[in-house]
From Swiss-Prot:
Keywords: Cell membrane, Lipid biosynthesis, Lipid metabolism, Magnesium, Membrane, Phospholipid biosynthesis, Phospholipid metabolism, Transferase, Transmembrane, Transmembrane helix. It comes from the Archaea. It comes from Methanothrix thermoacetophila (strain DSM 6194 / JCM 14653 / NBRC 101360 / PT). GO terms for biological process: glycerophospholipid biosynthetic process. This is CDP-archaeol synthase. It is a multi-pass membrane protein. One of its GO terms (cellular component) is plasma membrane. Its cofactor is Mg(2+). The lineage of its organism: Archaea, Methanobacteriati, Methanobacteriota, Stenosarchaea group, Methanomicrobia. It is an enzyme of class 2 (transferase). The keyword Lipid biosynthesis applies.
């Protein structure tokens, strides 16, 4: 099987949460408007309860759909039973946690919402997805995310991220094209 297809397949439940958050988000900010002693918001208005829930749910739904057709196309499964839930939750919630972590860091650095932070913006969600998935389902993670897959994901994700953000900007789902 093509390693590019394999890599993107494994990462789809981590790639889509931020798109779902942008499309279905809004409403109450996760940080409830709170600022830290540095005077900056914890996350800012761009990270909302509804967006976070939509992102995690979207990633899980996409992963469930993928899992239902994986065998037909000879692509890897995300497991079954509890492992399936843990893997998909790890990939999708971890993606959102990685993005939240980057937002937290950007606020501490005094960066405004939407400010570009090269490579951090493109890979924060990957690191979060990998970290949480490894914690929740280490055997599955180690079997699927081999060194070649990890390297390829790190190389192609910034390109895919930019492409998705430009589309999001063009359709009005994002305020910045990065």
């Amino acid at each position: 099987m093509n390693i590019i297809v394999h890599s993107i397949w494994l990462m789809l439940p981590a790639y889509v949460p931020n798109n779902f958050a942008a499309l279905f988000g809004g409403g109450t900010p996760l940080d409830m408007g709170m600022s830290l002693p540095d005077g900056h918001r914890v996350f800012g208005n761009g990270k909302t309860i509804r967006g976070t829930i939509a992102g995690v749910a979207g990633g899980i739904i996409v992963g469930l759909l993928q899992n239902s057709i994986a065998g037909v196309f000879g692509l890897p499964s995300f497991g079954d039973g509890m492992e399936l839930f843990l893997v998909l939750f790890g990939l999708s919630a971890g993606s959102m946690l990685g993005d939240l972590t980057a937002s937290f860091i950007k606020r501490r650095l005094g960066m405004k919402r939407g400010a570009s932070f090269f490579l951090v913006d493109q890979l924060d969600f990957v690191m979060g997805a990998w970290a949480l998935t490894f914690l929740l389902a280490p055997e599955w993670f180690n079997a699927q995310f081999t060194s070649p897959v990890i390297i390829l994901v790190l190389l192609i994700t910034p390109v895919l991220h930019r492409f998705a953000n430009v589309i999001g900007y063009m359709i009005g789902a994002k305020k910045e094209p990065w």
